[in-house]
A protein has these predicted regions:
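Phosphate-group recognition and catalysis centered on beta-loop-alpha active-site segments
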Residues: 1-125
């Protein structure tokens, strides 16, 4: 049986935050699922919903999102990469996130010997 930490160890620490990801890596999960999308300024952030307080997530600057406890995908790769736990990335929102995701994965996969990254998403036409 494969144990996937949905949005990290979310039942213990909440969704898509660094503490839930690090705990999932240490608690015997086989994989971490997380949601990625773009901020207003084009950074890849880790957040599930497309709205935050009734506003589209892409209306928020990175600084505003960081103040709300939302982390960047790059920070997650930096911290989780050395654990070598596989990641399951769920792409949300604009497909432009794929280009930035690939750029960041190229930056972190080799140094951390990350072997398994799974990507899913859908785009309504």
């Amino acid at each position: 049986m494969i144990k996937i930490a949905h949005r990290g160890h979310s039942d213990k620490f909440g969704d898509n935050n660094m503490q839930s990801f690090l705990d999932a890596a240490q608690c015997g999960f086989n994989m971490i699922e997380l949601d990625i999308q773009l901020s207003k300024s084009g950074e890849v952030i880790v957040y599930h919903d497309t709205y935050l307080d009734g506003k589209d997530i892409t209306d928020y600057s990175l600084g505003q999102l960081l103040k709300r406890g939302i982390v960047t995908f790059e920070f997650v790769l930096f911290k989780i990469g050395p654990t070598n736990i596989p990641l399951f990335l769920d792409i949300k929102g604009d497909v432009k996130v794929v280009h930035e995701m690939v750029r960041l994965l190229k930056k972190y996969i080799k140094p951390h010997r990350m072997r398994r990254i799974y990507v899913s998403g859908f785009n309504r036409c």
